[in-house]
Amino acid sequence: AMAVEPNDDGTQIRHWAAQGIIGIRLSAASRAQHSDPLAQWRTAAELDLVVSAPATPSILLGDEFAEVLRTFPNLSIVIEHLAGVDNSAVPPYEDYARTLAFAEHPNLSIKLPGFGEFCALPHPFSDVPPLAEMAIEAFGPSRVMWGSDWPPVSSREGYDHSLSFPMEHLSSLSDDERAWIFGETALEVWRF
């Protein structure tokens, strides 16, 4: 996905879409430094691009993201990093659970990172909070996709473990559910 400059009014997005990109990366609260603050979101919607959106629970629960959801109900948005929840989250994970209510929007999917983002290091993780399971329950496997978070994952559990640990941890899911999470969802959302 293309990183978008804050002052882009959609011109650069259009340029790169003509070259074949299929997605852009915007913070869930992103606003263009332009007369139309939603210009980047609007351009993505007009061009049928996917928006990969890094966020935190507080950003997702804010007015800016609510406006995006209201204004662009058909825009495909991937919420990155399990909505930005990290290893400081504690049960009952109220803010995180509130972000998972966005699963009611069929245009949203969520990215499952390496577990080092939300488990206490080092790997192997001894205590795994149920955050992945909560996301899968809310969104369903066909709207959850694994992503390594490379290169930052290299300084946490390492790339190999970022895939092998979630696959092992979620081994109780059916083969079909795991196929969606570890491949099919990304293929469908990113149109490969």
Model-predicted segments: where are they?
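Short, well-structured secondary-structure segments
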Residues: 1-6, 22-25
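Short, acidic/polar
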Residues: 5-16, 36-37, 94-95
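Catalytic pocket-lining loop regions of alpha/beta-barrel enzymes
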Residues: 31-145
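Short beta-strand segments
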Residues: 1-4, 111-114, 145-147, 182
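Glycine-rich phosphate-binding "P-loop"
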Residues: 16-31
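Mid-to-C-terminal alpha-helical segments outside catalytic/metal-binding sites
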Residues: 134, 138-145, 154-192
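Short glycine-enriched loops at secondary-structure junctions
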Residues: 4-8, 29-30, 150-153
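Divalent metal-coordination and catalytic microenvironments
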Residues: 24, 44, 81, 110, ...
